[in-house]
Amino acid sequence: EIETDHRKYALRCFHKRLDALHERYDAITKHLAGVKGPYLVACQFQPQGITTESGTYPVVRMDWVDGQSLAAFVAEHLQDSGALQQMRFSLRRLARHLRENGIAHGDIQPSNIVVQRGANLRLIDYDGMFVPALEPFCSTELGQRNFQHPSRRRRHFNASLGAFSFSVIDLALDALSRQPGLWPRTASGEDA
């Protein structure tokens, strides 16, 4: 988190080379600029973002998103089945929005979904994101394994990437809304 001119940003510094990083983030930022809706955060790729004694490294700057992770929200509302069921519907709207805009986040998991006031959802961490212009590429990451299909490979890189992840979260929220006692037996931290 950094603050400049009374605005907060999240800053991600890349300390190792990733395939076509500039081209990927260029495609992502261009696509997101044309997408309306409350779920995505403005981001900017800066190829010469930070200079240290060992070299110059690219950064991605995103608007800061206040709120709590989906995991924290679930833990806080574990005894409120209505809130968990409402979150299921909110996540379904988010999934539909991404699908309708040809986007896959690439790493849907509780720590990449921020719940803001009023249960508004925002996605963060776009490193594995798919947009149509990236169709010729492979994925740079496979996402948090607890939320990815076991057969997922780098070549599986298209707009349907998030379907399995959203289904897992939907099923988990439904189960927890009916049996909150499952949470302490199955949760393993922020990415559970």
What are these regions, as identified by a protein language model?
Residues 151-160:
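Conserved end of the kinase activation segment
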Residues 137-151:
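Conserved activation segment of eukaryotic-like protein kinases, specifically the C-terminal portion
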Residues 1-42:
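ATP-binding glycine-rich loop module of kinase domains
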Residues 95, 99-111, 115:
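Catalytic-loop of the protein kinase fold
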Residues 39-86, 136:
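Conserved structural core of kinase catalytic domains
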Residues 125-130:
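Activation of the activation-loop gatekeeper triad in protein kinase-fold domains
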Residues 112-124:
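Conserved protein kinase catalytic/activation segment
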Residues 175-192:
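Helical subdomain adjoining the active site within ATP-dependent kinase catalytic cores
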